[in-house]
A protein has these predicted regions:
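C-terminal motif of bacterial Sec signal peptides marking the signal peptidase cleavage site
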Residues: 3-7
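Zn2+-dependent metallopeptidase catalytic domains
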Residues: 8-235
Length: 235
């Protein structure tokens, strides 16, 4: 009974999460009116689960590797993850807060591990390499766009360490995890510095040439920072 209740609760939560289906807005833009902070982590987890299943299906496909069943299938995978990542990281880079920053620190290593699980997947790499070899040998003819996509994925696997031995791959995973965390920390420090920066202008003549609306806005900003009679500009 308790398992059924949990399952129903999870289904209800999933149903209300705007990231788990296409945005029903003009041009498919993010539905910010419905998006809440608590939607992000479940969407990331669901997105990882979805893409893992899609990768598993590619790897276990009994048919010979082809452009369609390997490269196209790989490129089409991770729809939920792409949707939530696009919104989440756009906000954390421009309009973040302590709650989002804490969540980003939690999500980044998770995504690093997920990426490694894809691009260090030997069976998946073999299929991608097989399609690449088919084109190199002239056994398949691809359009310019198809060639670009194949070449992009093949190089990404190689550059991500798919050809390394198991020991070196494990070390690479550790480095990638550390980098993901350090990158987030560095970005947060830069953002904090930008948010703290104030350019204070004491003389109105120094603002000559600026539109009146900009000058008025700077005066309001100065008042908000307790600097009446001056003009403040932020980054």
């Amino acid at each position: 009974m308790s398992c059924m209740v949990c399952a129903c609760g999870q289904q209800a939560a999933d149903t209300g999460n705007p990231f788990l289906s296409e945005f029903e807005t003009p041009y498919g833009t993010p539905d910010f009116d419905r998006i809440k902070v608590e939607h992000y982590e479940p969407a990331f987890l669901k997105g990882i689960e979805q893409q893992n299943g899609e990768i598993k299906a590619i790897v276990e496909n009994p048919e010979e590797p082809s452009f369609e069943n390997t490269i196209v299938a790989l490129d089409n995978s991770g729809e939920i993850l792409a949707r939530v990542s696009g919104v989440f990281f756009a906000l954390t880079e421009a309009d973040t807060n302590d709650e989002m920053m804490a969540l980003e620190a939690k999500i980044a290593p998770m995504l690093s591990e997920h990426s490694d699980n894809i691009f260090l997947n030997q069976e998946l790499y073999k299929r991608v390499a097989a399609v690449h070899a088919q084109e190199e040998a002239g056994k398949i003819q691809l359009t310019t766009e198809q060639h670009y996509l194949l070449d992009k994925y093949y190089k990404e696997f190689v550059r991500s360490g798919a050809g390394l031995d198991a020991q070196k791959q494990e070390r690479l995973r550790e480095i990638n995890k550390q980098l993901s965390t350090l990158t987030i920390e560095f970005g947060n420090h830069v953002l904090a510095d930008n948010n703290d920066y104030l350019l204070v202008v004491d003389k109105k003549e120094d603002l000559a040439g600026l539109p009146d609306a900009v000058i008025a806005g700077a005066a309001q900003e100065a008042k908000a920072h307790g600097k009446d009679g001056k003009w403040v500009f932020t980054l």
